Amino acid sequence: MQPHYDLILVGAGLANGLIALRLQQQQPDMRILLIDAAPQAGGNHTWSFHHDDLTESQHRWIAPLVVHHWPDYQVRFPTRRRKLNSGYFCITSQRFAEVLQRQFGPHLWMDTAVAEVNAESVRLKKGQVIGARAVIDGRGYAANSALSVGFQAFIGQEWRLSHPHGLSSPIIMDATVDQQNGYRFVYSLPLSPTRLLIEDTHYIDNATLDPECARQNICDYAAQQGWQLQTLLREEQGALPITLSGNADAFWQQRPLACSGLRAGLFHPTTGYSLPLAVAVADRLSALDVFTSASIHHAITHFARERWQQQGFFRMLNRMLFLAGPADSRWRVMQRFYGLPEDLIARFYAGKLTLTDRLRILSGKPPVPVLAALQAIMTTHR
Protein backbone atom coordinates (compact mmCIF):
# COMPACT_ATOMS: atom_id res chain seq x y z
CA MET A 1 0.00 0.00 0.00
CA GLN A 2 1.25 3.46 -0.90
CA PRO A 3 1.57 5.37 2.41
CA HIS A 4 -0.71 8.36 2.79
CA TYR A 5 1.29 9.62 5.78
CA ASP A 6 4.74 9.36 7.27
CA LEU A 7 3.23 8.65 10.69
CA ILE A 8 -0.21 7.78 12.02
CA LEU A 9 -0.71 8.25 15.76
CA VAL A 10 -3.66 6.21 17.02
CA GLY A 11 -4.91 7.98 20.12
CA ALA A 12 -4.58 11.75 20.54
CA GLY A 13 -3.66 11.63 24.21
CA LEU A 14 -0.64 13.06 25.99
CA ALA A 15 2.10 10.79 24.66
CA ASN A 16 1.04 10.81 21.01
CA GLY A 17 0.20 14.50 21.09
CA LEU A 18 3.68 15.34 22.37
CA ILE A 19 5.26 13.12 19.72
CA ALA A 20 3.29 14.93 17.02
CA LEU A 21 4.18 18.39 18.33
CA ARG A 22 7.89 17.62 18.67
CA LEU A 23 8.11 16.03 15.24
CA GLN A 24 6.39 19.05 13.73
CA GLN A 25 8.93 21.32 15.41
CA GLN A 26 11.96 19.27 14.38
CA GLN A 27 10.79 17.81 11.06
CA PRO A 28 8.13 20.21 9.74
CA ASP A 29 7.76 18.44 6.39
CA MET A 30 6.63 15.19 7.99
CA ARG A 31 3.08 14.12 7.16
CA ILE A 32 1.38 13.28 10.47
CA LEU A 33 -2.17 12.10 11.20
CA LEU A 34 -3.70 11.78 14.68
CA ILE A 35 -6.83 9.65 15.14
CA ASP A 36 -8.97 9.33 18.27
CA ALA A 37 -12.44 8.00 19.04
CA ALA A 38 -13.04 10.73 21.64
CA PRO A 39 -14.53 14.15 20.81
CA GLN A 40 -11.53 16.09 22.18
CA ALA A 41 -7.79 15.46 22.05
CA GLY A 42 -6.32 14.74 25.46
CA GLY A 43 -9.64 13.69 26.95
CA ASN A 44 -10.46 15.27 30.31
CA HIS A 45 -7.24 15.39 32.32
CA THR A 46 -4.77 17.54 34.20
CA TRP A 47 -1.09 16.64 33.80
CA SER A 48 1.42 17.92 36.34
CA PHE A 49 5.18 17.71 36.66
CA HIS A 50 8.10 19.04 38.70
CA HIS A 51 10.73 21.45 37.41
CA ASP A 52 13.59 18.95 37.63
CA ASP A 53 11.60 16.31 35.72
CA LEU A 54 12.57 18.04 32.45
CA THR A 55 15.68 19.61 30.96
CA GLU A 56 15.70 23.32 30.17
CA SER A 57 15.36 22.49 26.46
CA GLN A 58 12.30 20.37 27.18
CA HIS A 59 10.77 23.12 29.30
CA ARG A 60 11.13 25.48 26.35
CA TRP A 61 9.45 23.31 23.76
CA ILE A 62 6.44 22.35 25.88
CA ALA A 63 5.98 25.90 27.23
CA PRO A 64 2.95 26.62 24.96
CA LEU A 65 1.09 23.80 26.72
CA VAL A 66 1.69 24.95 30.29
CA VAL A 67 -1.29 26.70 31.89
CA HIS A 68 -0.16 27.05 35.51
CA HIS A 69 3.21 27.27 37.27
CA TRP A 70 3.99 27.60 40.96
CA PRO A 71 7.44 28.16 42.54
CA ASP A 72 6.83 25.65 45.35
CA TYR A 73 4.42 23.04 46.70
CA GLN A 74 3.32 21.61 50.05
CA VAL A 75 2.87 18.18 51.63
CA ARG A 76 0.98 17.39 54.83
CA PHE A 77 1.12 14.32 57.06
CA PRO A 78 -0.05 13.59 60.60
CA THR A 79 3.33 14.59 62.11
CA ARG A 80 4.97 16.49 59.25
CA ARG A 81 4.13 19.56 57.19
CA ARG A 82 6.60 20.87 54.66
CA LYS A 83 6.97 23.36 51.83
CA LEU A 84 9.35 22.30 49.06
CA ASN A 85 10.96 24.98 46.92
CA SER A 86 10.72 23.18 43.62
CA GLY A 87 8.70 24.48 40.68
CA TYR A 88 5.46 22.67 39.89
CA PHE A 89 3.70 22.87 36.52
CA CYS A 90 0.28 21.98 35.14
CA ILE A 91 -1.06 21.28 31.63
CA THR A 92 -4.81 21.04 31.09
CA SER A 93 -6.40 18.86 28.44
CA GLN A 94 -8.30 21.92 27.19
CA ARG A 95 -5.06 23.78 26.38
CA PHE A 96 -3.57 20.58 24.98
CA ALA A 97 -6.54 20.13 22.62
CA GLU A 98 -6.41 23.78 21.52
CA VAL A 99 -2.72 23.52 20.60
CA LEU A 100 -3.17 20.25 18.70
CA GLN A 101 -6.17 21.62 16.82
CA ARG A 102 -4.26 24.77 15.88
CA GLN A 103 -1.18 22.86 14.73
CA PHE A 104 -2.78 19.89 12.95
CA GLY A 105 -6.31 21.02 11.99
CA PRO A 106 -7.56 18.68 9.25
CA HIS A 107 -4.97 16.07 10.23
CA LEU A 108 -6.49 15.66 13.69
CA TRP A 109 -9.39 13.22 13.28
CA MET A 110 -11.57 13.15 16.38
CA ASP A 111 -14.74 11.04 16.83
CA THR A 112 -13.05 8.46 14.59
CA ALA A 113 -13.09 4.85 15.78
CA VAL A 114 -10.28 2.47 14.77
CA ALA A 115 -10.96 -1.21 14.11
CA GLU A 116 -7.42 -2.49 13.49
CA VAL A 117 -3.88 -1.22 13.98
CA ASN A 118 -0.94 -2.61 12.02
CA ALA A 119 2.71 -1.61 11.71
CA GLU A 120 2.09 0.42 8.54
CA SER A 121 -1.66 0.86 8.28
CA VAL A 122 -4.84 1.58 10.21
CA ARG A 123 -8.33 0.34 9.40
CA LEU A 124 -11.17 2.51 10.61
CA LYS A 125 -14.44 1.02 11.85
CA LYS A 126 -16.21 2.56 8.89
CA GLY A 127 -13.94 0.47 6.64
CA GLN A 128 -11.35 2.93 5.32
CA VAL A 129 -7.74 1.74 5.35
CA ILE A 130 -4.98 4.35 5.67
CA GLY A 131 -1.32 3.59 5.02
CA ALA A 132 1.74 5.11 6.66
CA ARG A 133 5.46 4.57 6.93
CA ALA A 134 4.86 3.95 10.64
CA VAL A 135 2.02 3.70 13.16
CA ILE A 136 2.16 4.26 16.93
CA ASP A 137 -0.59 3.02 19.26
CA GLY A 138 -1.07 5.44 22.14
CA ARG A 139 -4.56 4.53 23.34
CA GLY A 140 -3.75 4.48 27.04
CA TYR A 141 -3.05 1.83 29.63
CA ALA A 142 -3.88 -1.77 28.78
CA ALA A 143 -3.45 -4.59 31.29
CA ASN A 144 -0.48 -6.87 30.63
CA SER A 145 0.04 -10.21 32.37
CA ALA A 146 3.79 -9.54 32.51
CA LEU A 147 3.28 -6.71 35.02
CA SER A 148 2.03 -6.80 38.59
CA VAL A 149 0.55 -3.42 39.45
CA GLY A 150 -1.38 -1.48 42.03
CA PHE A 151 -3.18 1.73 41.19
CA GLN A 152 -3.34 5.38 42.14
CA ALA A 153 -7.06 5.89 41.63
CA PHE A 154 -8.63 9.31 41.95
CA ILE A 155 -11.58 11.55 41.27
CA GLY A 156 -10.88 15.25 40.86
CA GLN A 157 -13.32 18.15 40.84
CA GLU A 158 -12.66 21.70 39.74
CA TRP A 159 -14.69 24.12 41.85
CA ARG A 160 -15.39 27.82 41.88
CA LEU A 161 -15.50 29.03 45.49
CA SER A 162 -17.66 31.77 46.94
CA HIS A 163 -14.62 33.22 48.76
CA PRO A 164 -10.84 33.07 48.13
CA HIS A 165 -9.24 29.83 49.27
CA GLY A 166 -5.99 31.45 50.45
CA LEU A 167 -3.65 28.85 48.90
CA SER A 168 -0.57 30.25 47.19
CA SER A 169 0.86 26.89 46.11
CA PRO A 170 -0.38 23.34 45.47
CA ILE A 171 -0.85 20.80 48.22
CA ILE A 172 0.22 17.74 46.27
CA MET A 173 -0.28 15.37 49.18
CA ASP A 174 -2.43 15.88 52.28
CA ALA A 175 -2.44 12.55 54.09
CA THR A 176 -3.87 13.92 57.33
CA VAL A 177 -7.26 12.64 56.12
CA ASP A 178 -8.90 9.36 57.12
CA GLN A 179 -7.05 6.61 55.24
CA GLN A 180 -10.12 4.48 54.41
CA ASN A 181 -8.27 1.12 54.26
CA GLY A 182 -5.40 2.21 52.01
CA TYR A 183 -2.98 5.05 51.42
CA ARG A 184 -5.24 8.03 50.79
CA PHE A 185 -4.46 11.71 50.34
CA VAL A 186 -6.09 14.84 48.93
CA TYR A 187 -4.39 16.83 46.16
CA SER A 188 -5.28 20.50 45.67
CA LEU A 189 -4.23 22.86 42.87
CA PRO A 190 -5.02 26.60 43.21
CA LEU A 191 -6.00 27.63 39.67
CA SER A 192 -7.09 31.15 40.62
CA PRO A 193 -7.88 32.90 43.92
CA THR A 194 -11.37 31.36 43.82
CA ARG A 195 -10.83 28.21 41.70
CA LEU A 196 -9.47 24.90 42.96
CA LEU A 197 -8.90 21.44 41.56
CA ILE A 198 -9.40 19.02 44.46
CA GLU A 199 -8.60 15.33 43.96
CA ASP A 200 -9.42 12.47 46.31
CA THR A 201 -6.61 9.98 45.69
CA HIS A 202 -6.13 6.38 46.83
CA TYR A 203 -3.23 3.95 46.40
CA ILE A 204 -5.20 0.73 46.14
CA ASP A 205 -4.82 -2.81 44.84
CA ASN A 206 -7.30 -2.43 41.98
CA ALA A 207 -8.50 0.39 39.76
CA THR A 208 -12.02 0.63 41.18
CA LEU A 209 -12.97 3.62 43.31
CA ASP A 210 -16.44 4.39 44.65
CA PRO A 211 -17.23 7.69 42.88
CA GLU A 212 -19.92 8.80 45.32
CA CYS A 213 -17.65 8.18 48.28
CA ALA A 214 -14.83 10.13 46.59
CA ARG A 215 -17.15 13.05 45.81
CA GLN A 216 -18.30 13.15 49.41
CA ASN A 217 -14.67 13.01 50.54
CA ILE A 218 -13.95 16.11 48.44
CA CYS A 219 -16.89 18.02 49.92
CA ASP A 220 -15.92 17.00 53.45
CA TYR A 221 -12.29 18.02 52.90
CA ALA A 222 -13.29 21.40 51.49
CA ALA A 223 -15.47 22.03 54.53
CA GLN A 224 -12.61 21.09 56.86
CA GLN A 225 -10.36 23.61 55.07
CA GLY A 226 -13.00 26.33 55.30
CA TRP A 227 -13.47 26.42 51.53
CA GLN A 228 -17.01 27.33 50.48
CA LEU A 229 -17.78 25.38 47.30
CA GLN A 230 -20.05 27.30 44.94
CA THR A 231 -20.03 25.89 41.39
CA LEU A 232 -18.73 22.56 40.12
CA LEU A 233 -16.94 23.38 36.85
CA ARG A 234 -15.53 20.02 35.84
CA GLU A 235 -14.88 16.49 37.06
CA GLU A 236 -12.16 14.06 36.01
CA GLN A 237 -11.24 10.59 37.14
CA GLY A 238 -8.47 8.13 36.49
CA ALA A 239 -6.45 5.16 37.69
CA LEU A 240 -2.70 5.38 37.18
CA PRO A 241 -0.78 2.07 37.26
CA ILE A 242 1.89 1.69 39.96
CA THR A 243 4.39 -1.05 39.06
CA LEU A 244 5.25 -3.63 41.72
CA SER A 245 7.15 -6.19 39.63
CA GLY A 246 7.24 -7.72 36.19
CA ASN A 247 9.15 -9.12 33.25
CA ALA A 248 10.18 -6.64 30.55
CA ASP A 249 10.85 -9.32 27.91
CA ALA A 250 7.41 -10.85 28.38
CA PHE A 251 5.82 -7.40 28.39
CA TRP A 252 7.22 -6.50 24.97
CA GLN A 253 6.33 -9.91 23.54
CA GLN A 254 2.73 -8.80 24.13
CA ARG A 255 3.44 -5.44 22.42
CA PRO A 256 4.62 -6.39 18.89
CA LEU A 257 3.59 -3.00 17.45
CA ALA A 258 5.06 0.40 18.32
CA CYS A 259 3.19 1.96 21.24
CA SER A 260 3.62 4.95 23.50
CA GLY A 261 2.75 6.37 26.91
CA LEU A 262 0.97 4.19 29.46
CA ARG A 263 0.46 1.46 26.84
CA ALA A 264 4.25 1.18 26.58
CA GLY A 265 4.67 1.12 30.36
CA LEU A 266 6.28 4.56 30.22
CA PHE A 267 5.31 6.19 33.50
CA HIS A 268 7.00 6.86 36.83
CA PRO A 269 6.65 3.55 38.66
CA THR A 270 5.74 5.13 42.01
CA THR A 271 3.80 8.29 41.16
CA GLY A 272 2.22 7.20 37.88
CA TYR A 273 3.24 10.54 36.31
CA SER A 274 3.78 10.00 32.58
CA LEU A 275 4.57 13.44 31.14
CA PRO A 276 8.38 13.46 31.66
CA LEU A 277 8.86 10.13 29.90
CA ALA A 278 6.43 11.14 27.14
CA VAL A 279 8.52 14.27 26.54
CA ALA A 280 11.72 12.19 26.47
CA VAL A 281 10.25 9.74 23.92
CA ALA A 282 9.09 12.62 21.73
CA ASP A 283 12.62 14.03 21.78
CA ARG A 284 14.14 10.67 20.91
CA LEU A 285 11.80 10.01 17.99
CA SER A 286 12.26 13.51 16.59
CA ALA A 287 16.02 12.87 16.40
CA LEU A 288 15.75 9.68 14.31
CA ASP A 289 17.60 9.77 10.99
CA VAL A 290 15.61 6.85 9.56
CA PHE A 291 11.86 6.96 10.12
CA THR A 292 10.22 3.56 9.58
CA SER A 293 7.96 1.28 11.58
CA ALA A 294 11.00 -0.81 12.53
CA SER A 295 13.15 2.16 13.60
CA ILE A 296 10.34 3.64 15.71
CA HIS A 297 9.56 0.32 17.38
CA HIS A 298 13.24 -0.20 18.15
CA ALA A 299 13.68 3.33 19.52
CA ILE A 300 10.67 3.08 21.85
CA THR A 301 11.38 -0.45 23.10
CA HIS A 302 15.06 0.34 23.67
CA PHE A 303 14.13 3.46 25.64
CA ALA A 304 11.51 1.56 27.67
CA ARG A 305 13.92 -1.27 28.49
CA GLU A 306 16.54 1.24 29.64
CA ARG A 307 14.01 2.79 31.98
CA TRP A 308 12.87 -0.60 33.26
CA GLN A 309 16.43 -1.45 34.27
CA GLN A 310 16.74 1.89 36.06
CA GLN A 311 13.44 1.55 37.92
CA GLY A 312 14.03 -1.62 39.96
CA PHE A 313 14.57 0.34 43.16
CA PHE A 314 11.27 2.18 42.70
CA ARG A 315 9.40 -1.09 42.21
CA MET A 316 10.89 -2.38 45.45
CA LEU A 317 9.68 0.74 47.27
CA ASN A 318 6.24 0.23 45.76
CA ARG A 319 6.10 -3.29 47.15
CA MET A 320 6.92 -1.90 50.58
CA LEU A 321 4.13 0.64 50.19
CA PHE A 322 1.51 -1.86 48.98
CA LEU A 323 2.54 -5.13 50.64
CA ALA A 324 4.27 -4.30 53.95
CA GLY A 325 2.23 -3.52 57.04
CA PRO A 326 -1.44 -2.58 57.52
CA ALA A 327 -3.05 -0.74 54.60
CA ASP A 328 -4.16 2.16 56.78
CA SER A 329 -0.54 2.73 57.90
CA ARG A 330 0.95 3.09 54.42
CA TRP A 331 1.09 6.85 54.93
CA ARG A 332 4.04 6.32 57.30
CA VAL A 333 6.25 5.34 54.35
CA MET A 334 5.51 8.60 52.55
CA GLN A 335 5.73 10.73 55.69
CA ARG A 336 9.25 9.45 56.31
CA PHE A 337 10.21 9.98 52.67
CA TYR A 338 9.18 13.64 52.79
CA GLY A 339 11.57 14.21 55.67
CA LEU A 340 14.53 13.55 53.35
CA PRO A 341 16.64 16.30 51.70
CA GLU A 342 14.85 18.39 49.10
CA ASP A 343 17.31 17.66 46.28
CA LEU A 344 16.88 13.91 46.87
CA ILE A 345 13.10 14.28 46.62
CA ALA A 346 13.50 16.17 43.33
CA ARG A 347 15.71 13.39 41.94
CA PHE A 348 13.17 10.81 43.09
CA TYR A 349 10.40 12.45 41.08
CA ALA A 350 12.73 12.81 38.09
CA GLY A 351 13.64 9.11 38.32
CA LYS A 352 17.34 9.98 38.72
CA LEU A 353 18.27 8.65 42.16
CA THR A 354 21.96 8.19 42.89
CA LEU A 355 23.35 5.24 44.84
CA THR A 356 23.77 7.54 47.83
CA ASP A 357 20.12 8.59 47.51
CA ARG A 358 19.00 4.97 47.57
CA LEU A 359 21.04 4.20 50.65
CA ARG A 360 19.66 7.31 52.34
CA ILE A 361 16.06 6.27 51.60
CA LEU A 362 16.62 2.82 53.14
CA SER A 363 18.69 3.92 56.14
CA GLY A 364 17.31 4.31 59.65
CA LYS A 365 14.30 2.71 61.28
CA PRO A 366 11.84 1.47 58.64
CA PRO A 367 8.33 2.98 58.77
CA VAL A 368 6.82 -0.51 58.39
CA PRO A 369 7.50 -3.77 60.32
CA VAL A 370 10.95 -5.16 59.44
CA LEU A 371 9.78 -8.70 58.59
CA ALA A 372 6.91 -7.41 56.45
CA ALA A 373 9.31 -5.03 54.69
CA LEU A 374 11.75 -7.86 53.91
CA GLN A 375 8.94 -10.07 52.61
CA ALA A 376 7.71 -7.25 50.37
CA ILE A 377 11.22 -6.58 49.04
CA MET A 378 11.66 -10.26 48.14
CA THR A 379 8.29 -10.50 46.40
CA THR A 380 8.68 -10.58 42.62
CA HIS A 381 5.08 -11.19 41.62
CA ARG A 382 1.73 -11.08 43.37
Swiss-Prot record:
Where it sits in the cell: the answer is: Cell inner membrane
Q: Where does NAD(+) bind?
A: 6-36
> What regulates the activity here?
Activity is increased in the presence of NAD(P)H. NADPH is not involved directly in the cyclization reaction, but must play an indirect role, e.g. as an allosteric activator.
Pathway the protein contributes to = Carotenoid biosynthesis; beta-carotene biosynthesis
Which biological processes are named by the entry's GO terms?
A: carotenoid biosynthetic process
For this protein, the record's Pfam families field holds: Lycopene_cycl
Gene3D superfamilies per record: FAD/NAD(P)-binding domain
Carries keyword Isomerase?
Answer: yes
Q: Name one GO cellular component term.
A: plasma membrane
Membrane-traversing stretches: none
Give the family from UniProt: Belongs to the lycopene cyclase family.
Q: What does this protein do?
A: Catalyzes the double cyclization reaction which converts lycopene to beta-carotene. Also catalyzes the double cyclization reaction which converts neurosporene to 7,8-dihydro-beta-carotene via monocyclic beta-zeacarotene. May also convert zeta-carotene to bicyclic 7,8,7',8'-tetrahydro-beta-carotene.
**The protein, known as:** Lycopene beta-cyclase
